[in-house]
């Protein structure tokens, strides 16, 4: 890491032009291996027959020597494709080498983007906003904004992405031609490139291999989409403050957007007014985005048309307009980040007293509401083999080889994580149903292991099993809200808590 940092500080003006030689440096592969392949949070652990940390440098040196050979990459890829079932160890090491090259290349192409972070002097250090890293920080923002808005657009970022578009996006920031050619080779020739994007699932579902490179490419693509979108949004807000003379300079610019040529100055505001909505809010997580506005339905339709044209003409692919759904907030519930969110209108009657006369005034208060969607969660549990499709708990046979404490700990950890993530739900009944499924599945797994009945295990381990599923979130609630309310299985607490330490979504929520 220190050697990499030293390279960054040597000559920052040359880094964007000389990235390719770094592929022949040993510390790049060591850095990629330590911070990529063995990362337990973002990457799957790599297990290699006969491989340990002591032999890692030997493997790296062997890989670098082979890379100096002519057409090594092409031959290795062809060999991996043709001999997948012949010579397990040979294929495994060849596949591992290709993965090391991919991960190391991802580290290298991230260097120009890392310069933005290390180029700031220490006295101008960017203030840390750790709280904003939490996924839950999005929901207080939605609570504050959505209750005052009228329409929401539910957007799925379109796919498939043409592979050449990904290269062109990076070409604007990386001028190293050999690196770009290598990227094209990795995308077009590797045997798993067609799993870069899986059309059957959301756009953020990538292959388990080469995650670092694919996530980097996807983030670059989304960043480019949002950059153009935010740029036009800022320019449109600026229009209201400019003089008529400035408008004449921007006719051609906005004419390209809407395919309109405006001649008369009096029609500028009529043509461009829908770009100047001050109550437009945009939130995105991975492949799904929410665009909300206080404007009319016509305004949202024009924004939809604009986004479709942007993706079609700027990124050169059909953007599937049906992936943008416009709905009125008062009649619609949208699924976002594992919650089913909506804006409810609560009726309120106020008695008004004026001298001797009194009368009632009926009004309504809009409130942002979030609940746990039961059906998607049960579907995720069924895919993970905790229950059937209908929600009937079943045992987990693959865990019967573990000790009783490990089995209870695993089920309890899953239950606590789900409770922690869904602590912002206003209705806890559905969450208690999920806890019940996990608790009974744990009991069935233990009974299957000891070849006994579920009833006997519930009687013997009832209190212990209940304590494991007594979540940390409920203990926090008991401290914050001292009002004595028992935490029964069918309780109905409505307090919502958003935690600021959740940096990634739960796997069961993300199915």
UniProtKB/Swiss-Prot annotation:
Keywords: Chloroplast, mRNA processing, Plastid, RNA-binding, tRNA processing. It comes from Bromelia plumieri. The gene is matK. It is found in: Plastid, Chloroplast. One of its GO terms (molecular function) is RNA binding. GO terms for cellular component: chloroplast. The keyword Signal does not apply. The keyword Plastid applies. Belongs to the intron maturase 2 family. MatK subfamily. Its main location: plastid. This is Maturase K. GO terms for biological process: mRNA processing; RNA splicing; tRNA processing. Usually encoded in the trnK tRNA gene intron. Probably assists in splicing its own and other chloroplast group II introns. It holds the Pfam family MatK_N.
